[in-house]
Design a protein with these regions (language model features):
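Boundary at the C-terminal end of the N-terminal hydrophobic targeting segment
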Residues: 36, 40-44
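A broadly used, surface-exposed interaction patch
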Residues: 110-114, 118-135, 140
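Generic hydrophobic alpha-helical segments
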Residues: 51, 182, 275, 408-409
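A small-residue-enriched
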Residues: 51-118, 232, 276-345, 350, ...
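Amphipathic alpha-helical coiled-coil segments
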Residues: 63-78, 143, 147-168, 201, ...
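Bacterial N-terminal signal peptides
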Residues: 22-36
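Acidic, low-complexity, intrinsically disordered peripheral segments
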Residues: 2-3, 17, 40-41, 226, ...
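Periplasmic alpha-helical coiled-coil/stalk elements that build and connect Gram-negative outer-membrane
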Residues: 3, 8, 12, 16, ...
């Protein structure tokens, strides 16, 4: 902040005609300010672009695709029986000559054995892996919805900090204009301008430094937080979108871009939906339902462990004719094996009970998750309603009132019926109201993003 010198006051009676020239100077400064604040074309990152980049480069989504392929392969593999076993042996070979035709029991034996699955274990294992593959698809839906919410919230923080700097620039410009106007009145001896008037405006200008530091800190932190979703820092040339008015929409449509819903339609969906009912179909809740299905298959697999496992085998034994030429018949053997899982019944019952308890716990988790989502939805709906009321109040009343107050205080000071402190406060109040409206717009957009996270995936479930 540059220093401003305060000249000595000259004779007032000699400078009455300068009052008009001071007013013209103020108009000239305002015109220069407007010309200097034309929009400059820059590379901006819109919310829609940020969302697309975050989803495109998210490693977890790519990992879920690989995990889904893995579970589909596991499902196919689990449908097959165990590999058959082939055996070959020479049996009953005499040790006194090792002749193959010496003893009638000597034979070359080839066998084949096939073990069957235990009950329907393979069927339930296949179903389990199929459900786990479906779980990866739903988990990707949750991740996309979560990414959209988090990226939107971070992007809004970035936009708020950027636009707040714009408001601070506007506040600085107003105070600078007021300083020039007051300085001109004082130096030319117009009206009752005093040295204290200039000092008051200078003090207000100096106090902006702290606000600038805070705003730039918020902007840099939000920018750094946003870059983590892209896997690389944002280029310095990339900036947040700026508008000429804080009342412009903050890309709310981008929050709803995948739903084919307008903002009014989305608000109607929220208003007419019963959260505790509709949010049962939210992907977060569906994940727990799918987990319950997985645990149900684990219960079935545990029950199949109580059944016997069978194995069948067949063998062929070749015998060479006797040394005296007598013919010897070959041997064919058939057999069956079965285990007896009846001696560890207590362990098996405990395994079934554990699997069943885990399934019941998953069902409870589902109900808790639905309650949590529904309660959060109710809070967000109430917050959105209050923010909409505040937004309407600011736009229809406070903005205009503060503008009129600022003009009235400046007129009063110009005619020597007002105080410079009132002029400064009125101008600061005008910018403060605009900043408050910006905060409301940002918070309203954040609330809509959180509601979109809850309702849009559920809406897509019903209208697929």
């Amino acid at each position: 902040m540059s220093n401003y010198s305060v000249p000595k006051k000259v004779n007032e009676s000699a400078n009455r005609p300068c009052k008009v020239s001071a007013l013209f100077a103020l108009i000239f400064v305002l015109s220069s300010f407007l010309m200097a604040n034309k929009p400059v074309v820059a590379q901006t990152l819109s919310l829609e672009q940020a969302l697309q980049l975050a989803i495109q480069y998210d490693p977890l989504l790519k990992g879920n695709a690989h995990r889904k392929d893995r579970f589909n392969a596991e499902a196919e593999a689990s449908s097959y029986w165990a590999n058959p076993q082939v055996s070959a042996s020479v049996q009953n070979l005499p040790t006194d000559g090792f002749a193959f035709d010496q003893e009638p029991m000597t034979q070359f034996k080839v066998g084949l054995k096939q073990q069957l699955p235990r009950g329907d274990e393979n069927l339930y294992s296949q179903k389990k892996y199929q459900v786990m593959a479906d779980q990866m698809s739903v988990e990707s839906q949750v991740r996309k919805a979560w990414l959209k919410r988090e990226v939107t919230l971070t992007w809004l923080d970035w936009v708020y900090a950027t636009r707040r700097i714009g408001l601070l620039d506007k506040e600085k410009s107003l105070l600078t204009q007021l300083l020039d106007f007051t300085d001109s009145r004082y130096s030319q001896g117009v009206g009752a301008a005093a040295q204290q008037d200039i000092l008051q405006v200078r003090l207000a200008l100096l106090s902006l430094d702290d606000k600038y530091v805070e705003a730039y800190q918020q902007k840099n932190e939000a920018r750094s937080a946003l870059s983590k979703w892209f896997g690389a820092p944002l280029d310095e040339s990339v900036s947040a979108p700026l508008t000429q008015s804080t009342r412009d929409a903050i890309e709310v449509d981008a929050i709803l871009n995948d739903s084919n819903l307008s903002l009014s339609s989305f608000l109607t969906v929220i208003e007419n939906s019963e959260p505790f009912s509709i949010l049962q179909h939210h992907p977060e809740a569906m994940l727990l339902q799918i987990q319950t299905q997985i645990e149900a298959q684990n219960v079935n697999i545990a029950r199949e462990q109580t059944k016997s496992q069978w194995a069948f085998e067949a063998s062929y034994g070749y015998r060479q004719d006797a040394q005296n030429g007598a013919s010897r018949a070959d041997f064919v053997s058939l057999g069956v094996q079965v285990d007896l899982p009846f001696f560890n019944k207590s362990r098996q019952d405990a395994s079934i009970a554990a699997a069943a308890s885990k399934m019941s716990a998953s069902e409870t988790d589902f109900r808790l998750k639905v309650n949590e989502l529904a309660a959060n939805a109710e809070v967000l709906k109430s917050r959105l309603s209050a923010l909409s009321e505040r937004k309407a109040l600011y736009e229809t009343a406070l903005i205009g009132e503060t503008r009129q107050l600022s003009e009235a205080e400046l007129t009063a000071y110009t005619t020597d019926t007002g105080d410079i402190g009132d002029v400064v406060n009125a101008n600061l109040k005008q910018v403060q109201v605009q900043d408050d409206l910006l905060k409301i717009d940002i918070e309203r957009a954040r609330t809509l993003a959180s509601l979109a996270y809850l309702y849009l995936p559920t809406h897509a479930h019903f209208f697929e």
